[in-house]
């Protein structure tokens, strides 16, 4: 059974988050949670928080055990951009785009080999 958790409007660029997301795909849920604790990027902290939420959803809503779960996929999509203006020469203004991301973590049960 698939279980998912979504973190919307995360204040990080999706481009910076996708390499962290790719690194945990296919791992056991608990192993991925522990690996992300030592990953030296801001995106790892946000994905770890979302992964913890997905594990809690599986345990509380679907009565699944954390040791039976693996990371089926982590999707990082673009969210809306905040626009800020910076004054430039001759009275003009430059646009600074503050990017956001939507992080979706999908967990699934491991297949039993019996």
Swiss-Prot record:
It holds the Pfam family Ribosomal_L22. Disulfide bonds: none annotated. Gene3D superfamilies: Ribosomal protein L22/L17. GO terms for molecular function: rRNA binding; structural constituent of ribosome. GO terms for cellular component: cytosolic large ribosomal subunit. Keywords: Ribonucleoprotein, Ribosomal protein, RNA-binding, rRNA-binding. GO terms for biological process: translation. The keyword Cell division does not apply. NCBIfam families: rplV_bact. Part of the 50S ribosomal subunit. Belongs to the universal ribosomal protein uL22 family. This protein binds specifically to 23S rRNA; its binding is stimulated by other ribosomal proteins, e.g. L4, L17, and L20. It is important during the early stages of 50S assembly. It makes multiple contacts with different domains of the 23S rRNA in the assembled 50S subunit and ribosome. This is Large ribosomal subunit protein uL22. It comes from Methylacidiphilum infernorum (isolate V4).
